[in-house]
Every structure is written in C-alpha cells, then in structure tokens.
Amino acid sequence: MVGIYRILASFVPLLGLLFAFHDDDMIDTVTIIKTVYETVTSTSTAPAPAATKSVSEKKLDDTKLTLQVIQTMVSCFSVGENPANMISCGLGVVILMFSLIIELINKLENDGINEPQRLYDLIKPKYVELPSNYVNEKIKTTFEPLDLYLGVNMNTSGSELNQNCLILKLGEKTALPFPGLAQQICYTKGASNEFTNYKLSDIQGNLNENSQGIANGVFQKISNIRKISGNFKSQLYQISEKITDENWDGSAVGFTAHGREKGPNKSQISVSFYRDN
C-alpha cells in the first residue's frame, strides 16, 4: 500500500503537465511508432512540419508517454482476483517496454548512432539518465517509479555485425509487479524505417476468441495504441500470458519479424522478454 501511495504522489506534478496542454497545441495526426501504435489527436488545420518537430508535437510526445505510464499503473493496481486482469496488466507492461525501446531505437537511428561502441558510450545505466533529447526533462518524473535500466548486449552485437541489441529492464524497486523483467531487442542497423512503415512480415498470430477479446480491451484502454496488426497483437499477448503465469521459470519468450525486402541484407527485429534477477 505504501508503494501505491508513493507512485500516486510521484504523479502529482505530472497532472499539471497534462492539464497545461490545450487542444490547439495538438497537431492533426502524429505517428510515433506505427508498428506499435497510431495516435489520433484533436483536429487542426495546421499540418505537421516535414523536417523538424514542432513545439506542439514535442508536447504531444510528452503527454502520450505520461498517459501510457499512468494507464499501465492503473491497469496493474486494479488486478484483484481475476486472472484476466493480471494478463491485462502484463500486456500493458509489455506494450510500454516495447514502445519505449522501439522509440529509442528510432531516435538513435535518426541520429546515425549505429555502432555498438557508440551505443555503449551513449546508453546510461538508468533510462532517466539518457540525454534530454532522448528523455525530456519534463517527463523524467514519469519514469522514476518504473526503475528502468538500459544496456547494450555487446556480445550479441559483435556476433552479428549488422545488428545491434538493446536491453531494457525493470529494476528491483519498480512500482510494477514484474521486478527483474527484461526485454532484449536486436535489430538490423539502419532499418528503423522498416519498423515504422508496416513492412515487417513472418509474424505468426493465433489468438483464440477469448484471448482476442482481452487483448482488444487492453489496447482500447491504452490511448497511445490506436492501431496494431493482428499478428503483433497476438505475439505481445502471448508474451504477457507467459510472464504472468506463476509457473513461468523466467526463460526467454518472444518472436522475430523480418522485413519484406528480399536479399542477403534483409532486415529483421528480434524481441525477447525474460527474467533477470
């Protein structure tokens, strides 16, 4: 109970940030990571700038991330005795971690940071310690209760010269009910456009009707997620189902998706969740 009060208290300054934004600050449509979600905001006649982000778009990013964290917290604090609610909590956590690391990859790619050593030099142990152009100072308070840690898997990156591997982990002091949950994403260098343009293929999806209903309910509750392919939804749901199973031994669970382009340099992204205590 003390932990819950601590989290709620930490979100008090965030509410001021949220209410400070007005409808006219929002641009028409902003897609951060199309592979994961598409957010539709209030209508405006002003188009988004082509080359650089506007002040409104930066504010929108802050709002979206803040809302996603808060909604994940609410989902996990209202689990009760219903196993389906626990899966919903797990799915919210999986989506949040996946969204954060994909957005980080896109920013790194846009800045031309592709070499493992450069990644290693830039990545800080705690997510909130990243440079301000990666984690805005205004929303650092949002991430403090999550106790997020970052890392670069140099061994994996070294074995596959055309790939980088980043790790995002929930620390032991996280407010979420998954301390030690880690996510590793390995991705083809220079292929972030593959992640943002629905060009990934070879992802299997096989949710039954009941599971599909639970997944749809969770995605509808999380405002950041407007659109996601059925196959991605299936994979993320199956990961959440696994990590919330009390018999899970912590071994890796995940999937690999390939770009649609043919040839030896075909891009791919591999996602795995595991327990790292």
Curated annotation (Swiss-Prot):
It is a multi-pass membrane protein. The keyword Transmembrane applies. Residues 22-84 are cytoplasmic. Its main location: membrane. It is found in: Membrane. The chain crosses the membrane at residues 1-21, 85-105. Glycans are attached at N155, N265. It comes from the Eukaryota. Keywords: Glycoprotein, Membrane, Transmembrane, Transmembrane helix. This is Uncharacterized membrane protein YPR027C. It comes from Saccharomyces cerevisiae (strain ATCC 204508 / S288c) (Baker's yeast). The lineage of its organism: Eukaryota, Fungi, Dikarya, Ascomycota, Saccharomycotina.
